[in-house]
Each structure stands twice: as structure tokens, then as C-alpha cells.
């Protein structure tokens, strides 16, 4: 008879096979009421799952991440049930869990409208209130295909036909609705009470543009209404911070149909972009990197030798000239190897760090483009380190220190780290992989950093570490990476003369801290809601005169700051000073320097910040010193 071991180490003995729900009931009525699913020997299963042998068991509630995932999966089924109830001719396809929610794709004779979305959500609440039991059953493969065909659900039948023979076909039913699913699911629809449908979008069946366009309904679901309300509030704040809106409002950039996925930088936006580039250029210079520049258009033959043509040719922009095929480079690494290959290299030359603000282009699908976050033309703070196997750990350690310093300077303190190790298909010996993985792991552990292991998620050419920023809305952005490459230097003929006089192939470390500069501008803009710290602000201060009598003095003050290297302008328009203050505050200018007759006489300015606070009178020299200190410290106030 089964003995159940709980997470706290305690044991429960039963004299007969039991379900997970019965285990929960044996522990207490509160847990039985709260339980949604459970893990049996690590596998997530329904509460109806029978335990017939000794097992380790953990009950899952809405407070657990697993519980929220089960809720979202079950809410996707609830959505499909509501759609079928309201629109019987609609066909259901797939409905997975995604970050913060779920979606379900439907085939229907007409587009769903916002009014339809409201009706569907209302129907979902109605079905949830009925607390319909959710029941699992299995069915033979051919019988399941025939069952869904009899319902007119051709997509479901096609999905089952693609499932390998021998796999269990499980169905879940609630009320008069049945869906194909592995599960697990909540025990009844009454557990689903914190959800909202978000939007409708198009999606091709199986993600193939040659197939039918389906209608995708997105939704979100949470463990309780409080979490749902908090999420919706975060969405509202994210909407307010949307870099596309702020880009227009602050006159930073625009994009247009004639160049999809390409950025038209305006003067203010280009200042911001250049400040980031110049900062990273100093980082390169101060940390032993040599900056290079490589061609934008390179012959197909190089991409074939590097292996990129075989894997990425669909994502390349190509052209031809004089009977030769060319590609606009989608990445910089093969070109960096060409620079390395010029001249004989010795072990004394290593590590060799080559950096480039490399302009790259990738032919992303138009539907995937999203402002600055997903573009076709972008610039990377790209660098490649050529080193020996013995130097990997030290170079990775140096890079990690540098990355955290850079992120801190931009105002990011929370960084998530993932280490990805060898996949099944890979190049290089196990011995070399052992060394590389050990070097990355040791470098992380030596700094006391928390990190997650992703077994098998490394590239075919080597293991990697990924670094993701967490912004003020707790969103995670993967920006930094360092990847070990055993393949490309060999493919492209890179060698060095070792201490023994023989030629060896160097290891190549691909590394970036910010990634795409365009994307990083988008991240910064949303993180700060356009209120950039002084050192990054396109306009750092505006001098405002109250009347025409102070115009000449206002010009002199602005020029004094400009001569010290600050981006300061004078607004001498014949407008009320209150109007000018509001306008420049809305433009997120960090400092407003107001001058009236009193300030002219004293040789000072009255200082206001964009948050509306009055900081009193400052002499010009004192304020220049304040700006200098704040810029040097890269303070993130205001």
C-alpha cells in the first residue's frame, strides 16, 4: 500500500490506492479546498491522479507558480468552451500557456470584434460560476481522430494524426465541451475567477504563412483577483511608458512603411543613441578592447564558410553584383575573424579583444516587428575575444565584472543569469566542453552569483551565459551574453603559434553587454518613462527668461553651460514662464533654470526640476559643478 512523502519530509500511509485529492483531504480540509493539482515524483498531474505505489507528493495551490500555470491552461479551455457555446461554427485549434497568460487560436467565418470579446468573457464567467467538473479520459488514437472529425474539428484531428503512435491520447471534458490536452487542469471551472481577455490578433495555422490565417484571442489569468488587478495596473503603467508613444512625444525617432523595421533617428534621439555609444566606446577603451570596423556587405562565400548561410540565409538581405552573391551582414563574428587572420598571431598576442559597433540587418517577419524592440536594422556593442582554453575563465570573469558595472551605470541593479550547457548535436570533444562549462560555472560561482542551469540549451559550437535585466515594472529583458565558440575560428582558418611552436586554433568568445543599441534605447525609455538621468538626457537643461529684459542674460547662461560641454538651450519665446515650464517639464527636461530681474542682478538662476520641485537660487559656477558631479556619477535621480 502506498506511502506518500510530503515536501516537509513527513509521511502518510494509506491502506489502499488514493487520488491526490484524497491525500489533500487527509492532510486537512483547507488544503483540499485550495489544491488545484499536484506533483507526484516530480510530474505535474491532476488531483484525480491515482497513487498506487510509494511516491513523493507536493500539492499545488494558486499560490504556487505551478498552480498559476494550471489556472492559465484551464482558462484557455474555458475560453474555447465559451467560443463554441456562442459561435458553434468556430473550430478550435491550440491554446497554450504563455508568459502572464494564455491564448487560443480559432478558425471562424468572420473576424471577431471587440463586442464579441466582451460577450465571450461574459460567457466564460457564466461557465466558471457553474463550477463544472473537469474530467480526464484517454482514448485510442484512431477513435480520437474519428471523434473530433465527427464534431467537425478538423484541426484537432490533424493534431492527433501528428502525435506519434503509442503516445497516450488524453481528453478533458467540462460540461458539453471536450478538448484534446495533456493536462493537468483544475478540478472544476469554479476555480477560475481571476481572468480577463486582452486582445485579438491574427496567426497562421502551425505558424506557416502558407496556411490559413486564424484568429488568436489572448487572455490573462491569475491565482486571485488581487493579482489580476495588480497585473492590469502594471499593463496600464507599461502603456504609459511605451517607448513608441514616448518616441513620438519626445521627438526621438520614427519609423515608416518605406523602411519597415528601420529607425529614423531625430536629433534628440540620436543624441541619446550617441551618448550610449560613446559611453560603451570608453568601456571598450578602458578594458583592453581594440575597436574595429568591418564591411556592411560581404560575399556569400564567407557566410557559407562560416556556416551562417545554411542556417540563416532566409533572414539575410541579399544582393548581387558582377555575377557574385552578397549579403548584408546579419552578425559581425565572421568579419572579426577576418581581421584576426591578418598577420601571424602568437600565444603572446592572446587574449585579443576586438570590438565593433557593428551595424547588422536581419529580414525579420513584418508581423514580428515592434518599435525599437524588434527591428530589421540594428547596431550591437559587439566584441569577440580570441583566447586559449586556459584563458576562458579569466576572460569570462572580467566580462561579468564589466557587465555589472555597465548595468549599474544605466540604473539597473537586478540581473538574472542563465548558464546553457552542451546540446546533443555539437562540435568539439567532451573534454573541451567539460573545460568550457567548468570555466563558465567557476567564474559565476567565484563571484557568488545566483544563476539557473539550462541543460542542453547551449549553441552547437559552445556553452553560453545569458544576462537579463529586470526593469522598474519587473519585466525581464535579455541583453547580455558571453558564448564560447569552438567552431568558427576553425572553419575560418584562425590560428596562433603556441608556446610549443605548433599552430593551434584559438577559442572565440562572442560577447555583448547591451545587445542591440536600438533595443536598449527602447528599454531605457520605458524604464525611465522618458525621464532619463542627466548624463543621458538629450536636453539637460533649459534656461527660461521671465520677460524680454532677461533675454541676453539667459543666452549668456546657456552659452556658459554649453562651453562646459552640457546640452543646454535658452527658451526666449514671448510666452508666460508658467507655460514654458509646463512644456519643458512634459518634455522630461531634467533641469529648468529660470531667470528674472533678481537673478540677473545676482548672477544666478532659480533652479527647478522636472518633478516640479523648486531648489532655490544657484550661482552659475555652483550649478556647473553640480551638473558635473551628477554627470560623472551617472546619478539616476529626478
UniProtKB/Swiss-Prot annotation:
PROSITE patterns: AA_TRNA_LIGASE_II, TGS. SMART domains: tRNA_SAD. One of its GO terms (biological process) is threonyl-tRNA aminoacylation. Residues 1-61 form the TGS domain. Keywords: Aminoacyl-tRNA synthetase, ATP-binding, Cytoplasm, Ligase, Metal-binding, Nucleotide-binding, Protein biosynthesis, RNA-binding, tRNA-binding, Zinc. It is found in: Cytoplasm. Zn(2+) binds at residues 333, 384, 510. GO terms for molecular function: ATP binding; metal ion binding; threonine-tRNA ligase activity; tRNA binding. InterPro entries: aa-tRNA-synt_IIb, aa-tRNA-synth_II, aa-tRNA-synth_II/BPL/LPL, Anticodon-bd, Anticodon-bd_dom_sf, Beta-grasp_dom_sf, TGS, TGS-like. Binds 1 zinc ion per subunit. The keyword Disulfide bond does not apply. Its cofactor is Zn(2+). Residues 242-533 are annotated as: Catalytic. GO terms for cellular component: cytosol. HAMAP family: Thr_tRNA_synth (MF_00184). This is Threonine--tRNA ligase.
